[in-house]
Amino acid sequence: MKVLVNNHLVEREDATVDIEDRGYQFGDGVYEVVRLYNGKFFTYNEHIDRLYASAAKIDLVIPYSKEELRELLEKLVAENNINTGNVYLQVTRGVQNPRNHVIPDDFPLEGVLTAAAREVPRNERQFVEGGTAITEEDVRWLRCDIKSLNLLGNILAKNKAHQQNALEAILHRGEQVTECSASNVSIIKDGVLWTHAADNLILNGITRQVIIDVAKKNGIPVKEADFTLTDLREADEVFISSTTIEITPITHIDGVQVADGKRGPITAQLHQYFVEEITRACGELEFAK
């Protein structure tokens, strides 16, 4: 397996990170995950635009142009012969010696790019049968719009869900539902798609954006606004979405069944529209539903 370290492809076991890299010591960096279908990137530009936007919000300079970055990632995918999978890439602020919270202003740090590509098949069964979720207080910082390497709050919530045999943790600040530990959450109520507004309390998921777009194009009303735990529990349908899980229905929350406990009709429609978008961009999907 080859991975990318700056502009070099190296064997996985030969890849190294400096112990005084600010990403390693502070989580000082940003990242993205881009999906591949039939060996082709899906919503690549949207992901990379978000990467550069996240970097700009923390005054981090990515040491490659968008064109150079695409060329590097395409080489990474080709070298590993990825058909259906994910590319994980991150950029840290770089090495600072000696370690200091303060970013030096007397000399520029050189950002460090790393990336890996892996085959990750689509989970067709999960898209139909769905999964369960727990609710958990959202204790993360207030800049969730930045796709930062700082994910400890997400990790704790995700692992709590895992310990309870749940797929996800739906996060809330008091009564206000925000998103999940590693995905966005949406509800359907009276035929309306309802999801939290794209503000600082959530990451504006690329899949979320595609869902909103196809919903509007196909006459499904969309409401981007706060909703409560009560709204969540009384929803007709609940689903989560992300680059890797596409649109996955939630059938039970905190052990309580959502509606009839099955994927709802609008969730199914939205997933079909989503698959059509993938097909247009990347070609027909084998076994797609």
From Swiss-Prot:
GO CC entries: cytosol
Key words of the record: Aminotransferase, Pyridoxal phosphate, Transferase
One GO term (biological process): D-amino acid biosynthetic process
Taxonomy, superkingdom: Bacteria
Binding site for substrate: 31, 99, 101
GO MF entry, a single one: D-alanine-2-oxoglutarate aminotransferase activity
Residue sites binding pyridoxal 5'-phosphate per the record: 50, 179
Cofactor requirement: pyridoxal 5'-phosphate
Statement: the UniProt record of this protein carries the keyword Transferase: yes
A Pfam short name: Aminotran_4
Principal EC category: transferase
Coiled-coil spans in chain: none
Enzyme Commission identifier(s): 2.6.1.21
Catalytic activity, as annotated: D-alanine + 2-oxoglutarate = D-glutamate + pyruvate
UniProt similarity note: Belongs to the class-IV pyridoxal-phosphate-dependent aminotransferase family.
Its biological purpose: Acts on the D-isomers of alanine, leucine, aspartate, glutamate, aminobutyrate, norvaline and asparagine. The enzyme transfers an amino group from a substrate D-amino acid to the pyridoxal phosphate cofactor to form pyridoxamine and an alpha-keto acid in the first half-reaction. The second half-reaction is the reverse of the first, transferring the amino group from the pyridoxamine to a second alpha-keto acid to form the product D-amino acid via a ping-pong mechanism. This is an important process in the formation of D-alanine and D-glutamate, which are essential bacterial cell wall components.
Assembly information from the UniProt record: Homodimer.
Name recorded for this polypeptide: D-alanine aminotransferase
Gene name of the record: dat
